[in-house]
Amino acid sequence: MSFSVDVLANIAIELQRGIGHQDRFQRLITTLRQVLECDASALLRYDSRQFIPLAIDGLAKGVLGRRFALEGHPRLEAIARAGDVVRFPADSELPDPYDGLIPGQESLKVHACVGLPLFAGQNLIGALTLDGMQPDQFDVFSDEELRLIAALAAGALSNALLIEQLESQNMMPGDATPFEAVKQTQMIGLSPGMTQLKKEIEIVAASDLNVLISGETGTGKELVAKAIHEASPRAVNPLVYLNCAALPESVAESELFGHVKGAFTGAISNRSGKFEMADNGTLFLDEIGELSLALQAKLLRVLQYGDIQRVGDDRSLRVDVRVLAATNRDLREEVLAGRFRADLFHRLSVFPLSVPPLRERGDDVILLAGYFCEQCRLRLGLSRVVLSAGARNLLQHYRFPGNVRELEHAIHRAVVLARATRNGDEVILEAQHFAFPEVTLPPPEAAAVPVVKQNLREATEAFQRETIRQALAQNHHNWAACARMLETDVANLHRLAKRLGMKD
């Protein structure tokens, strides 16, 4: 098989039809998967020795949340080092990063893999990966044909990165090339709430306005502050962090504004405060609602006039600091209750941002779970860490009162438990590995069954086995709970399982 002019033209047209970059990238890899008749395709962006998925087709949704560090993925490292098409033999000893991440093929290894590095000039900007379950999946395509595809993809990605750079207000070093921008914090999520938050961050980052970031505990307010700072003209200067909730009243003023030698017992030398450290940069005040009213008044003066006084010093110091503040409280209610100054609230909330709780972010929980699974895989030296269908279903229906932080800890704990009960370096997280309170789950969806040559009885039994297996996984292998979920008698369920060969 070879590409016709019509096929290449169709790929080029699809790259122009999308409204935004994300839509175009998705059209590209979906079209490639159809043209190449492969099982999975992915477009990855290269940034700081890691590949970041931009669009996928045929892969588990959680792949979009993963960050593939080169040191943990030898195949991707080989692609990054190559200047041309990379074909991995079916018997390659290098593990495939997508093993266990192709839906319906979780237990099988990827057999055919092609990597296409994408360049803008001499700079590596990304890669296309193509995967198939058949060893000879890509043998019919020549390297020259694959290079044409890589050229089309590289052009689309290069244009997107240039436009992204022009739209941002980052001040790049004078010698920097267009693809050597300051590394920015990755905010994982495609839900409407997160998409809106990212747009608002882009808008406010270019200004010098103070920002009040509100959200429940564990939603990632500090990450939002980092993203604002890194996308601002102050990115080359420091971002200084201060947790107001952890400040004892006796040292809070010194921490903020500094002190001079002899100002109080223990002040054996002059010391700069957080405002001085953040001069020409950004100061992030976490849990600002915990500050005393006295300190709120002094903070207000700094925001109004731009000068500070060290404790024990009569002189004023000028500082140029942008303040980002975060709180998990409703500061409007705190103002009404007399616990927070109204004038300070208005000074801080010139551009308020609200971080949505995880329970309102839909499928973002699966993307974030994929990110944390990849983190655990690297830290523990495992070959792969993936979620079972039952585990994914559980995560999507748990409300996560502790938000993203709770999800992170839950994934780490589950990996440790799963690793302890499984031999080898491959970990599959099941529902029973998560210690969540009672979660009401909907009946499991029927797994997609490929059309195969089998009679109705065989197909029915296969469906019954899969349904029972998923229900057991979701109920920690408790047969009584499984029977209740499936709305059947437990004795009948045991008999059916025996007939299906699932029990002795």
From Swiss-Prot:
Keyword terms, alphabetized: ATP-binding, DNA-binding, Nucleotide-binding, Phosphoprotein, Transcription, Transcription regulation
Reported function: Required for the expression of anaerobic nitric oxide (NO) reductase, acts as a transcriptional activator for at least the norVW operon. Activation also requires sigma-54.
Annotated source species: Shigella boydii serotype 4 (strain Sb227)
NCBIfam families in the record: PRK05022.1
Protein name: Anaerobic nitric oxide reductase transcription regulator NorR
GO biological process: one example: phosphorelay signal transduction system
Domain (Sigma-54 factor interaction): residue spans on this chain: 187-416
Annotated metabolic or biological route of this protein: Nitrogen metabolism; nitric oxide reduction
GO MF annotations in UniProt: ATP binding; ATP hydrolysis activity; DNA binding; DNA-binding transcription factor activity
DNA-binding region: 479-498
Extent of the signal sequence: none
PROSITE patterns to which the protein is assigned, alphabetical: SIGMA54_INTERACT_1 (PS00675), SIGMA54_INTERACT_2 (PS00676), SIGMA54_INTERACT_3 (PS00688), SIGMA54_INTERACT_4 (PS50045)
4-aspartylphosphate sites (modified residues): 57
Annotated positions binding ATP: 215-222, 278-287
PANTHER family assigned to the protein according to its UniProt record, in alphabetical order: ANAEROBIC NITRIC OXIDE REDUCTASE TRANSCRIPTION REGULATOR NORR, TRANSCRIPTIONAL REGULATORY PROTEIN
